Regions:
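N-terminal/domain-start alpha-helical segments
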Residues: 205, 209-210
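Alpha-helical scaffold segments that form or flank carboxylate-/histidine-based iron centers
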Residues: 38, 66, 112-113, 150-161
Length: 210
């Protein structure tokens, strides 16, 4: 799949390997990740296959950089892939894998794990909101534009935001239900057995629901 992500980016503009790395860390990070060490070997393979063409660009005071462009063969390969039906993707979520066996650790430790994960997704959501704000300030609402590139970029960003919101809501619900479960099973006050940060989240969730 990495090659198709690269072809997609190159279909928009010429990019160096370093610029591709930056794009993977920004515009498409919310649905596809790639390590720097993966990008250059893949570019080399794709160049050998004729899907991209590299051109060395000299610079007066900086090192010469190699800029890549998608070829006609690369465009055909990308379009062929775009027209293929996509199956449901296998989900790999380490947090959910742990959650499946959280009965093996104390509830307060499980609560800390969930609360920490919520914090991470809060940060990620904030990052996507910043991207959304910058995009809107520069180009207007991407979902109301007549530019097809901006429109589809906007849709994928909308997905990323919705995913983070869903995950945060799940974490809050899980903390609330865990507190109730612990009180039910052990017969202790949920607030006494839930870490302080998680208590605040649970209390906030309860207040919002009320």
């Amino acid at each position: 799949m990495l090659r198709f992500a690269i072809l997609e980016l190159l279909s928009h503009k010429l990019l160096s390997g370093y610029e591709l790395k930056k794009r993977f860390g920004g515009s498409i990070v919310f649905f596809w990740r790639a390590a720097h060490s993966q990008i250059y070997p893949e570019l080399k393979r794709m160049e050998a296959e004729g899907f991209v063409a590299g051109d060395k660009v000299p610079h007066p005071w900086r090192p010469t950089k190699k800029v890549y462009a998608i070829t006609e063969a690369g465009t055909r390969e990308l379009v062929r892939w775009l027209r293929e039906r996509t199956d449901i993707q296998a989900v790999k979520d380490e947090m959910m894998l742990k959650c499946f066996a959280f009965d093996l650790i104390p509830p307060e430790e499980a609560a800390r794990q969930i609360d920490h994960h919520k914090t991470l997704h809060d940060r990620q959501l904030l990052r996507y909101r910043e991207i959304e704000r910058d995009l809107t300030q520069k180009h207007g609402d991407p979902l109301q534009t007549s530019d097809p590139i901006m429109f589809w970029n906007g849709l994928t960003l909308q997905y990323a935001i919705a995913f983070e919101q869903m995950y945060i809501e799940w974490c809050m619900s899980a903390l609330s239900q865990l507190a109730a479960f612990h009180a039910r099973v052990v017969g202790l006050g949920a607030r006494a057995e839930t870490p302080d940060r998680a208590v605040d989240v649970v209390a906030g969730a309860g207040g919002a629901a009320a």
